[in-house]
């Protein structure tokens, strides 16, 4: 999800990437080697894989909050917001990357909403400069081009592959995230511009959610619905022009 900042900070002395894994991974699908793993075994192996990724990507820190998904999907649950607030206060990031509000995974949307709430709880001067919602369980190719934030992922495809490939419990366990994630980035790069040559070999899209941390009156639902409305209008206008 956050390949761009990982690459940006990799081997740099003045840039640092900190990863926060909010949930415990207990409910993940499994087969093959992991078919007989119970939820607690899956939790432990998922944590081990996150630590491996942190070493490969040379993260400054990896924080695992270990919440069950049901806690994150509960809009009234405040402990995750409090934990995220404490992390933001300690790390003071300039940019935060989380899930986008149009993601089709309930837990991911829950993480995004709690991240927004945590940032809003900070004093205005202590808030990050940018908040991006990234692609996972729904790509963002559907957004109109003027709404897309594109991150060039042309460099270090080997490192990107390693960062995804380390999650063997997911890949061997039945989900080919290694192939799908890199293929999506290449597809984004090729299909981004219909009348021009490719300018990158890999591209990820994000939703700029920064307005939500600057205006507490702006509701997340109305914010994401505006993206959908612009997409609807774009499609309608094109069909009318060609009719």
Regions found by a protein language model. Name each.
Residues 1-90, 121-124, 227, 232-242:
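Active-site rim/loop-helix segments in enzyme catalytic domains that contact anionic ligands
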Residues 74-243:
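Metal-dependent de-N-acetylase/amidase catalytic core
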